Every structure is written in C-alpha cells, then in structure tokens.
C-alpha cells in the first residue's frame, strides 16, 4: 500500500502536464530545454523527478546562488536501493555520464527509503538540493563534501558530514545477495569502482538534487517557488494526494 501511495504522489508531481484530469500543471515556468535535455539523456529515470530537478536547478541559478553549473546529479530515493537511482548529467555536452546505485542512511529504511532527517546523529539521509564543495580523504576514503541548500531539510549536511563516498556495501552483487544495498550513516554512498570518477566530475560547485515525495519539502522548498508565481506549486498538487507515512527525525 505504501508503495502505491508513493507512486501516486510521484505521478501527481508533474511538470508541464497534469497528472490526472482536472489537476493543474505544476511548473509552466520551468526551463523546458533543461527538462527536455535531462529526459532525453536518461529515459529510465522518472520524468516527474527530472522535471522537479530542472525546476530546482533553474531556481537556484535565478536566485543568484550560482554563477552557473556544468553538472547536475539527481537521486530518486523513491526507488528501491537495488535499482540504479543516481544520474549524473553533463549539462554542457547534454549527455548522461553515470547511472548508478546509491545507498541511503541506515535509519532511513532497509531496501526502501522511508524516513529522512536533517538532525545530527540520526543516521538518516536528507532530501533537497545540494551544492558540491571540496574533496578530502576521510574514514571512507576519497569523499566529496555536500552543502545543503534547503533550509530545514538538508542545511545541516556539512555539520553532519553528509558526503559522497565509495563503499564496499554498494554493488550489484550485494543487492542480489541481500535484496538491498548496505546502508550508510546518511551519506549517498556509491560503488567503490566509480566513486573517484563520479566525485571528480561533481566536485567544486555542481548541483545534487535528492528527491523523495515528501509533502512538507515539496510545499516549503524555496527552489520550487521561483519565476512564474502564478504557476501551480508542488504543494498545491500534493494537497490533493493521499497522505504518505510521516517522516521522522
């Protein structure tokens, strides 16, 4: 039942097209060229999620938070951890660079992500828009710091040491054996074989959009409230959907 509600909400949050008869379109103001670019490059990704990622990225740029960006990473935490749910795009060359497995936090859920937190010590993942920062070597090896841009949802990421890193518990073999990936303490961990390349691609100011159909975030994130104030916001669409289990932490 939970998955069906989650799928329903993801379907409702559309860009440019109403999800069901009588429901308004979400974002007439989205840069359709960016959305089209992402959708063409990653046909396996949920177009609704890509549309929201495009909206958030353009909003961040419109607000003057970024001078420009060449790469965008999208994580769809509504998918099980056994499926590729991280996409990394080269926006200059208009192509998909990576389609990868990515782990979520230990207390976020088992195979499915269900709970998110911005609190130190929660060992949960955080949703929202991030900007990448510098790299360093830590207890998990080569790692990429992430600066959370969504107040109340991920803006404690630096303090929590939420970083991208490689991990031995992220692999197709682990997914096949356990029916899920291993879990981090909240970090978006990737396969060790690709970690350095992915990190070097994203370091130094790229955007990372971590999605989950959380009604509060969709209603409150400043990155869904940019140009085209008359356009229907995600919160207006979410209000018509069946409730999801509450996030904790």
Per-region residue spans from a language model:
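N-terminal secretory signal peptides that target proteins for export/translocation
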Residues: 1-5
